[in-house]
Amino acid sequence: MKFGYFCNTTNWKHKPYHELLDETREITEYCDQSKWDSIWYTEHHFNHEGMESLTNPLMMGVDAAARTKDIRIGQACNVITFHNPIRMAEDIALLDQLSKGRVEIGIGRGIYGREAINLNKEADMKDQAKNFRLFEETLTILKKAWKEKFFNHKGEFYTYPAPNYVWQHDMSPPNKDLVNLETNVMENIS
C-alpha cells in the first residue's frame, strides 16, 4: 500500500498568501521527511472565499522538487481544458526532469464554471459534451508530445503546427523532420 497526501491548500482565515505557501512548504517537507509516497497539489482559480487557494500545481511542484529528495510530486489535478496543451506538456516534462523523475500526473476537465469561462471559453462547463471533446483532444496532444519525437495534430480545437507556417529562422536551418524542405512549410513540431 502507498500513502499520498492530498494538499488541498485552503485559506479560510484569509492570511497573506506567502504565509499560506510557507505552510504548504512545511507540509511538503514534513511528508518527504516522514516518507510519505507522494504529495498532491490542486488547481483552482478565483476562490475569494478561501477554498482551494493554489492556482498552479506545477509551480508548487517545482518548489517541492527543490526542497525534497524522495517524495513523488502529483497534481490533483491539472485542469488541462484551461491550458494550451503544448505548454502543459512542456511544463509537466520539465517538472519531471527537475524532480529527477518524481512526477505523478493528475488531469481533469474542471468543475467550476467561473474558472472555465474565464480561462478558456471553449471549456465552458455549460456545454459538457464540448468540454469533454476538448479534454479528449488535449489529452491526445499531451500523449503525442510525450511519446513522439516529432508530431502533428489537426483537431476540432487545436492544429499543430500552425497551418502554412513557413520556416524562417536564420539561427536554425530547416530540419527534414519538421519542415517540408521544398516549401519550407512546417509540417511537424517537436
Regions from the PLM with identified roles:
Residues 87-190:
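Internal, glycine-rich beta/alpha segment that forms the wall or movable "lid"
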Residues 71-74, 80, 88-92:
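Outer membrane beta-barrel
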Residues 48-53, 78-83, 127-130:
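Glycine-rich "substrate-gating" loop/helix at the edge of Rossmann-like oxidoreductase active sites
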Residues 5, 75, 105-107:
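Structural beta-sheet core signal
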Residues 9-21, 78-86, 190:
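Active-site mouth loops of central-metabolism enzymes
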Residues 15, 50-51, 84-85, 114-117:
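Short Asp/Glu-rich motifs
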Residues 1-72:
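N-terminal beta1-alpha1-beta2 module of alpha/beta enzyme domains
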